[in-house]
Regions:
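Active-site-adjacent "subsite" loops/lids of carbohydrate-active enzymes
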Residues: 484-596, 604-607
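Solvent-exposed beta-hairpin/edge-strand motifs
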Residues: 309-324, 843-861
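Extracellular and organelle-lumenal recognition/adhesion modules and their flexible linkers in secreted
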Residues: 22-217, 227-273, 287, 309, ...
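Carbohydrate-recognition beta-sandwich/jelly-roll modules
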Residues: 190, 218-508, 612-613, 771, ...
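Active-site neighborhood of glycoside hydrolase catalytic domains
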Residues: 578-596, 606-685
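The substrate-binding groove and active-site-proximal loops of carbohydrate-active enzymes
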Residues: 443-455, 459-467, 548-592, 641-656, ...
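Active-site-proximal substrate-binding groove within the catalytic cores of carbohydrate-active enzymes
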Residues: 399-408, 477, 652-853, 859
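C-terminal beta-strand-rich structural cap/linker in extracellular carbohydrate-active enzymes
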Residues: 867-887
Length: 887
């Protein structure tokens, strides 16, 4: 990695000479930043220790003469089965402004096992001034044996930082690692400067349209209007009210690798940066769709951020984080709801496919079309008065399907501000109904591997989906959908016990498999690994060496792109191996006389025979890894991204998405289903292809009940809409008592999510459903109570607009229904540590009910207590209730 950072922000290439005036100017450092870390060279000692460094768990040794240039350093040495080692230093900052940090450090290694990961790294945790954390920002060192190498990265906080802890960390590997010359540098931002997509910005130019260009007006029938001259937006109106601000607007672009300013496109070109743009605007009845393509005209690799910006002064408006949370817009910072990656201009990507801002008069949303994924961010910037979508594109001639270019599609629309983010979400469903089609008519719980026929009284447990197809005939008889198991993006390589756990030894085992040492199936997987294995920036295959309960060896990360080319020496890619397994499983379970298949949009698993679909395990496994393997670029279907040094690469989740789309098309054409595990962790766009979604969880961490947060559960529900989402609890079931099982069941009930159980080690070692302890018998009464309620809710269907509220905001409210007879369900949850009471009221007219409504509390089994125009409710901590409102 490069030794220096030429601008405030990144490891830059030569700056492109720009002739036109930029729309927004980037501030470049006139002086070095402030060094915050004390004694980063470990030379100063107090009582034999390098002050003010502290030990991380098992700590470190101080070693005079072994540092860089013969100086003093720290060393961590770890053997198999030992704990974690490292040196840590916490900086109390109490900042009131936002500034970037540059994290640097050096390390050398001797016989370090495994592959690069955050277990051997510079590892930084921060706590923001508002108390929220940002954990695990890392730069990883190479494993094996190597001389001193430097790692550095830019940490871009979203908010002012209260404290920062820097670790020289060594865990999860064996061997010996030395650390030296660590530093944390804070880059000053001049007065009035703001952070804009990871770059410090000062001097935002007032938008000056080309008055020679003709006016172009784009209007919807519901009152949204854009007026443009060439690329500049001169008017933004909602309901006839002007909302536009004199801010840079339209399509803007910044060359990340060249550390350029931000420029606008003129007549479809940005000559200053050597880029062209084709953009088409499609005004519809209730939205404006915008699609196009940006192309490099310089004939070399590029790392570029493309933005489409609406000029909007939304000071005093609300920014919606999700259906439950919003923030008042003010100050000069960016408002965004993102997940962290290691690529792109600021290492961020939006969590939701839509962003919504509103006040009492107007609501405005920007949204990605999930059929056109990319690394994108939806942002409101209070300092620049811009509401925009930003794309990070890596451009290279090697992407044969779109050489040196990247395509995009997004929409702009208005929504009813009275319901904020929920109304924006409902409108998104209306705009993209095909992305939320529910093909499962009969929902139920998720059974992993165990033959359901072997569970006495299985009907009590509400099974709907069988992972692993252990007894397809039985599942067919009882309306349970069965799925063939595949894991798209990996090869788990079992290694002989006497083989050292190193990269080279793993490749040796793999090549022996290729030669047939362990049979035909192992040979095919070896070929697929050598064909589809993704590579890091040094050209090495991604390999994580580990001893998992199901595999002692290592796991290679593979691209499941079906179009990756094979060779006579390596005649398989990963997709081919999986397609072969899928075809064999369907043939093996083919009924002698198949009944007619329903239309895909109304498929009922009860009406099918044989396998009902494909199960993709670990969908977001390795999702954030970056693939630098150039021959894989040739078959890319999604725009490339770029790394911290501006090098184009593939984000792994896009390759998995491509395979997912391929399998989904095959299954849906046959009236079958697609099920995936480990989905809706960080990414939204895989959800539209799926019919059943789920993940494995452990809500009993370190002996304490720690359920997934409301924000996490909200995200799952919103992106599924009315599709089933299922959980599998992997925990110590002896300690996960019936009281906790009930809390788990009630929390799932509130969101319409199916609770399930698997195995403490997620490895079928002593699974819940097959254990001699028969945990399901202990919990059977709870299943019998909650499964019928859950089935009724999910059949009625979740709705984003509740048309109901509680006067105590600590009692959360969701809505399901109406049923065919008009019955509506309001689910209620106390997500606090204290008993909460309040009055629930509903807009009966909006819910299609009359004033003489009957209200029943279904969990407690009693009539709801009337209170004025609503119903009185009191809930214990983590308790849920269902109000059934009927005519």
């Amino acid at each position: 990695m490069k030794r220096h950072i030429t601008s405030v922000l990144l490891l830059a290439a030569t700056l492109i000479t720009a002739t036109g005036a930029p729309a927004m100017r980037i501030v470049r450092a006139g002086s070095k930043g402030t060094q915050l870390l004390l004694n980063g060279s470990f030379e100063e000692r107090q009582q034999g220790k390098p002050a003010p460094w502290s030990t991380w768990q098992q700590g470190y040794r101080l070693t005079p003469g072994e540092g860089r240039g013969g100086s003093q350093c720290v060393v961590c040495e770890r053997r198999e089965g030992e704990g974690e080692f490292g040196a840590s230093q916490t900086l109390t900052l109490n900042r009131t402004n936002i500034a970037p940090f540059i994290i640097r450090g050096w390390s050398k290694a001797e016989n370090v096992s495994g592959s690069p990961d955050n277990g051997y790294s510079l590892y930084v945790d921060i706590t923001y001034a508002d108390g929220t954390p940002l954990w695990g920002q890392t730069a990883d060192f190479n494993c094996g044996t190597h001389d001193w190498e430097e790692r550095q990265f830019v940490l871009l906080p979203d908010k002012p930082v209260k404290s920062l802890t820097s670790h020289c960390l060594f865990r999860g590997h064996t061997g010996k690692a030395w650390f030296d010359d660590a530093s944390v540098e804070e880059i000053p931002t001049p007065a009035g400067a703001v952070l804009f997509q990871g770059a410090p910005l000062q001097g935002v130019s007032e938008a000056k349209p080309d008055f020679k260009a003709p006016l172009r007006k784009l209007s919807t029938r519901d009152g949204l209007s854009l007026t443009m001259r060439d690329n500049t937006i001169t008017s933004l109106q909602v309901g006839g009210k002007e909302l536009g601000a004199p801010s840079p607007s339209g399509f803007l672009v910044r060359d990340f690798a060249a550390d350029s300013d931000v420029y606008a496109f003129t007549s479809g070109a940005c000559k200053e940066l050597g880029l062209s743009l084709e953009a088409n605007f499609h005004p519809g009845q209730d939205h404006i769709a915008i699609e196009g393509r940006m192309t490099d005209t310089m004939g070399r690799d590029r790392a570029v951020t493309l933005l489409f910006s609406l000029p909007l002064d939304a000071t005093g408006w609300q920014w919606g984080d999700d259906a439950r949370r919003s923030r008042l817009i003010g100050g000069s910072a960016e408002f965004a709801s993102t997940t962290s990656l290691r690529c792109g201009a600021n290492g961020k990507m939006s969590l939701y496919p839509l962003a919504a801002v509103w006040n009492e008069h107007a609501g405005l949303a920007l949204a990605l079309d999930m059929d056109h994924p990319a690394q994108y961010r939806l942002v409101y910037h209070a300092g620049t008065r811009q509401f925009f979508i930003a794309y990070d594109f890596g451009l290279t001639k090697d992407t044969v399907r779109f050489p040196s270019s990247a395509g995009f599609r997004f929409v702009l629309y208005r929504f009813d501000p009275r319901w904020g983010f929920r109304a924006a979400l409902q409108k998104y469903y209306d705009l993209f109904p095909q992305q939320f089609v529910k093909r499962v008519a009969r929902e139920g719980g998720w059974m992993p591997f165990t033959d359901i026929a072997k569970v006495p009284g299985f009907e009590d447990f509400g099974f709907g989906f069988q992972e692993g197809a252990s007894n397809v005939a039985f599942d067919d008889q009882h309306g349970i959908a069965s799925f063939i198991y595949v894991e798209p993006m990996s090869h788990w390589l079992a290694m002989p016990r006497d083989v050292p756990r190193t990269y080279d030894d793993a490749l040796s085992v793999l090549n022996k498999d290729l030669a047939g040492a362990r049979g035909k199936q192992a040979a095919e997987m070896a070929a697929a690994t050598l064909t589809s294995g993704i590579e890091n920036a040094e050209g090495r295959l991604f390999l994580h060496l580990e001893k998992a309960p199901w595999c002692d060896g290592g796991v290679f990360s593979l691209s499941p792109d079906p179009d990756i080319a094979t060779t006579p020496e390596h005649p398989f890619n990963k997709a081919m191996v999986m397609q072969q397994a899928i075809a064999a499983a369907f043939k093996r379970n083919e009924p002698k006389q198949a009944p007619p298949v329903s239309q895909p949009s109304t498929l009922n698993p009860q009406l099918t025979a044989g396998l009902d679909g494909v199960y993709l395990d670990s969908l977001e496994m390795a999702a954030g890894e970056m693939n630098y393997r150039r021959e894989h670029f040739r078959t890319a279907s999604v725009p490339l991204v770029f790394d911290r040094e501006g090098r184009p690469c593939q984000l792994m989740i896009f390759n998995t998405w491509k395979f997912e789309c391929d399998i989904a098309a095959q299954m849906h054409a046959r009236g079958k289903l697609l099920f995936a595990n480990a989905v809706l962790w960080q990414f939204s766009f895989p959800a539209p292809q799926l019919d059943v979604l789920g993940t494995e969880v452990n809500w009993l961490q370190r002996g304490a009940y720690q359920p997934d947060s409301d924000a996490v559960m909200n995200f799952r529900r919103a992106l599924c809409r009315q599709k089933p989402y299922c959980l599998l609890m992997n925990t110590d079931f002896a300690r996960f008592t019936p009281e906790l099982v009930e809390s788990y069941s009630q929390r799932c009930l509130f969101y319409g999510v199916w609770p399930g159980f698997f195995d403490e080690e997620a490895a079928s070692k002593d699974p819940y459903w097959a254990s001699a302890k028969k945990w399901y018998e202990r919990d059977r009464p709870l299943f019998k109570q909650y499964i019928p309620l859950l089935r009724r809710l999910t059949t009625a269907g979740w709705q984003p607009l509740t048309h109901a509220s509680c006067d105590n905001a600590k009692i959360l409210v969701e809505r399901f229904g109406p049923e065919a007879n008009g019955t509506v369900f309001l689910t209620l949850l106390n997500d606090t540590a204290d008993t909460q009471s309040g009055t629930v009221t509903a807009d009966l007219k909006a819910l299609g009910l009359n004033q003489r409504v009957s209200a029943q509390a279904l969990v407690s089994g009693s009539a709801a207590t009337p209170s004025g125009h609503g119903w009185q409710i009191s809930l214990r901590p983590q308790q849920a209730e269902v109000l059934c409102l009927s005519r």
